[in-house]
């Protein structure tokens, strides 16, 4: 598989090139990017950099090469506009010297209007830009995705309160297709490392990038592994490795497939989310007229809104039942391949990134998640 790098690296490459141009250094068609807590440098190609606005600003441009042909951000054009502002305040906080501004096509939180950017992306910018900002100055860095607003319409960002464009939520340097064998091997390697280090006998399997961002920004003390679409094989591997408890953590639209026994969750292989929800609604004796509306819903999110508009308590009851069913079907799946006492829990968050539902096996753990 072709190797590629996540969105934050291409943003950082363009930004570094822009700042260097602004302070008078010659343009190079690549930048070496340092990854926090790692020794290696990654070479990121930069398309161009030049001075603009009467040389008061510099524009750096890069194009994402994620290595994944089906990735939404593949070939995404990135503009970073850098300017320096004299400051008379001293601060020990690195982010006080870098003002990250969401420009056109970059996602912001609908409630706060703050840029949607992961901790990894922020640390990456600080690691690579702080040392080249002249002493006594603050960097204003505007990030623009010219095609970001259009591309965001093809994501579930709005379900999470992210508007105006694409969020910058990459959490690692390299990219892996969620359905690729590389993703599976990477997750297995992480699991093996956790076991070798005897870190913990409870592990969090995170489904989806938003779930990973939510989990890693918390104070959860358990190890976290992003599992992509390879949930089934990784659950079996964890059981074989004698892990005591695995908590599945994710958005309801991602996890619902497990309740239907679908353990490779890529959409091109299987979907059936609405059908699974309708089946559970029938078992829970939801009124027929509501079941009919559920069956006509385009998305799981729409179905949840239908239920909540009818009865909040019924919606919560059904989604807790969904969590419980996920736990039971996961255990059944594992036992097809190996006999185990490993418990599988399921904790689900909603469109507002609010953690709301859990199954019987995860009731003792949900308070740890709700603590942030």
Swiss-Prot record:
One GO term (biological process): anaerobic cobalamin biosynthetic process
Class of this enzyme: transferase
EC number(s) stated in the UniProt entry for this protein: 2.1.1.195
Metabolic or biological pathway: Cofactor biosynthesis; adenosylcobalamin biosynthesis; cob(II)yrinate a,c-diamide from sirohydrochlorin (anaerobic route): step 6/10
GO molecular function, one term: cobalt-precorrin-5B C1-methyltransferase activity
InterPro entries (UniProt xref): CbiD (IPR002748), CbiD_sf (IPR036074)
Keyword S-adenosyl-L-methionine found: yes
PANTHER family in the record: COBALT-PRECORRIN-5B C(1)-METHYLTRANSFERASE
Entries under NCBIfam families matching the protein: cbiD
Family statement: Belongs to the CbiD family.
UniProt protein name: Cobalt-precorrin-5B C(1)-methyltransferase
Organism: Prochlorococcus marinus subsp. pastoris (strain CCMP1986 / NIES-2087 / MED4)
């Amino acid at each position: 598989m072709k190797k590629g790098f996540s969105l934050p690296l291409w943003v950082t490459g363009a930004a570094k090139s822009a700042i260097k141009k602004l302070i008078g250094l010659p343009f190079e068609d690549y930048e070496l990017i340092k990854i926090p807590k790692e020794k290696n440098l990654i070479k990121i190609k930069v398309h161009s950099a030049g001075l603009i606005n009467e040389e008061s600003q510099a524009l750096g441009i890069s194009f994402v090469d994620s290595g994944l042909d089906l990735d939404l951000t593949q070939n995404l054009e990135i503009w970073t506009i850098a300017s320096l502002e004299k400051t008379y305040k001293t601060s020990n906080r690195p982010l006080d010297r870098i003002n990250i501004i969401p420009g056109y096509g970059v996602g912001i939180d609908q409630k706060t209007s703050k840029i949607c950017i992961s901790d990894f992306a922020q640390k990456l910018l600080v690691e690579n830009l702080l040392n080249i900002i002249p002493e006594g100055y603050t960097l204003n860095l505007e990030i623009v995705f010219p095609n970001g607003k259009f591309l965001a319409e093809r994501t579930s960002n709005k379900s999470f309160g992210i508007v105006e464009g694409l969020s910058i939520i990459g959490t690692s340097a390299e990219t892996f297709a969620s359905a690729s064998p590389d993703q599976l091997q990477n997750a297995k390697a992480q699991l093996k490392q956790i076991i070798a280090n005897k870190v913990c006998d409870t592990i969090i399997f995170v489904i989806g990038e938003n779930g990973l961002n939510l989990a890693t920004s918390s104070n959860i003390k358990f190890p976290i592994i992003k599992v992509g679409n390879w949930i089934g094989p990784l659950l079996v591997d964890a059981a074989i490795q004698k892990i005591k408890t695995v908590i599945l953590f994710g958005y309801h639209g991602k996890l619902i497939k497990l309740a239907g026994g679908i353990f490779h969750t890529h959409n091109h292989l299987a979907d059936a989310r609405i059908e699974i929800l309708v089946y559970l609604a029938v078992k829970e004796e939801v009124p027929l007229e509501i079941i009919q509306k559920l069956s006509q819903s385009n998305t799981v999110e729409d179905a949840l809104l239908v239920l909540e508009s009818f009865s909040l308590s019924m919606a919560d009851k059904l989604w807790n039942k969904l969590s419980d069913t996920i736990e039971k079907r996961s255990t059944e799946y594992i036992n097809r391949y190996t006999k185990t006492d490993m418990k599988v829990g399921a904790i689900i968050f909603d469109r507002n990134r609010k953690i709301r539902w859990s199954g019987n096996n995860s009731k003792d753990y949900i308070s740890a998640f709700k603590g942030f």
